UniProtKB/Swiss-Prot annotation:
Top-level taxon of the source organism: Bacteria
HAMAP family in UniProt: DNA_ligase
InterPro entries on file: ATP-dep_DNA_ligase, DNA_ligae_ATP-dep_bac/arc, DNA_ligase_ATP-dep, DNA_ligase_ATP-dep_C, DNA_ligase_ATP-dep_cent, DNA_ligase_ATP-dep_CS, DNA_ligase_ATP-dep_N, DNA_ligase_N_sf
Transmembrane spans: none
Catalytic activity: ATP + (deoxyribonucleotide)n-3'-hydroxyl + 5'-phospho-(deoxyribonucleotide)m = (deoxyribonucleotide)n+m + AMP + diphosphate
Listed SUPFAM superfamilies: ATP-dependent DNA ligase DNA-binding domain, DNA ligase/mRNA capping enzyme, catalytic domain, Nucleic acid-binding proteins
EC number: 6.5.1.1
Lineage: Bacteria, Bacillati, Actinomycetota, Actinomycetes, Mycobacteriales
Name of the molecule in the record: Probable DNA ligase
Amino acid sequence: MLLIDIASTSLNVGGTSSRLAKVARIAEPLRAAAPDPELVAIVVAWLSGELRQRQIGVGWATLRSPPAAAGSPALTVTGTDAAFSEIGAVSGKGSAARRRELITRLFAASTETEQAFLVRLLSGELRQGALAGIMVDAVARAAEVPATAVQRAAMLGGDLPTVAAACLAAGSSGAAGALDSFTLRVGRPIGPMLAQSAGSITDALERHGGATIFEAKLDGARVQIHRTGDEVTVYTRSLDDVTARLPEVVQATLALPVSDLVADGEAIALQPDGRPHRFQVTASRFGRSVNVAAAQAKQPLSVFFSDILHRDGRDLLDAPTTDRLAALDAVVPARHRVDRLTTADAAAATDFLRATLAAGHEGVMAKSPTAPYLAGRRGAGWLKVKPVHTLDLVVLAVEWGSGRRRGKLSNIPLGARDAATGEFVMLGKTFKSMTDAMLDWQTARFTELAVGGTDGYVVALRPEQVVEVAFDGVQASSRYPGGLALRFARVVRYRDDKGPADADTIDTVRALY
């Protein structure tokens, strides 16, 4: 299978807003790839906007100026995937130059359509509307099995490309059996359950219909912990094995009175007074090049267990939250458990939220006592409640959209005002929470503000439009000149009542950090 086949499919998928059409268009290359499990896994990953290698060390600076495109397509899917692996394996002195050389070679062999696809894939900007649910439906359609069976297998297998490869390789007669082979297995990570957002404590209580389990929401790193006998493995939220980097988590798990275990938890760096360090301090312990012994001595991590999915031969995924927490409390000491309160009283829950925030944490999780653990899914059984920060920032440029946003000026780079120079300092970009009406309005508005026309993918703007942006926090970032970036930024509204001189300053942002 050629790379152009997948690049063209991506274009076709992005060109329709119909869910059924997206599913049908993705199913076609999956059927064609079915005899080759490796090829299926690559196609599923790519059309989901992901690399199988996850990260290969290629950023925007490398992708910004690709070489002249090839005249005709010749690259294969497996050959391109192998090139990604080669690029990702480069390390040591001169590695940046070597990666640029390899990526330039790959792009020189790509047509314009293929180059556009590769840029979006490598930059994480492949927004064609093929979200996980659509990909599950496409795999189910290609394999002629129920989507619920694919979803369940992906939940337990922890990886949709692997599940799709096994399912499609088995053929129509063996696909169902292949899916049934994916069960909870200690040592094999599964997708973590995710939370929906609630607007307030009262909202969470109303949605859960009464008594709710409130837990402190720590601003650490999600970990999934597996133990079989004396062997412990630790995985990140994205299912990367980080066991060797987190000896504290391993030691705490080995101290538990269990033989085998699968648990959900949080690793976090705490200050001497028990308050959390900034998230970046915790995140620094997860780097691939970290000297673990030195890092542990400088900044040890603490681990807090919040859920248990398997214990000593008993699977607990389908058990209600109360049963899972009882199993957790029976083996995990209080010092390693997340603080929690079960109540139907809004005042008591609000006091718990305030105390949690005062302790330096993000907010609270509200969990339904009867909810099962929906691995890999964002269920209403878990709700997150946390304060929302907003800033008034200036739109510095805008990018043309894809998928349902095709033909609209969409993704906006955001800048805070530097009071000393009058310039604007970029803090990231977003298209989150933009309605269709907002996209229509800003396409017209930004066309008026465009500097040098609107033909390019990125359209430069006069820095005049102020936008109110909500975000979850500020983090350190080497990607932007100011050294800071907003976490999970989304648009609230455009502020036509404000000019660029009214925008928040970079000093205000630094104070939030």
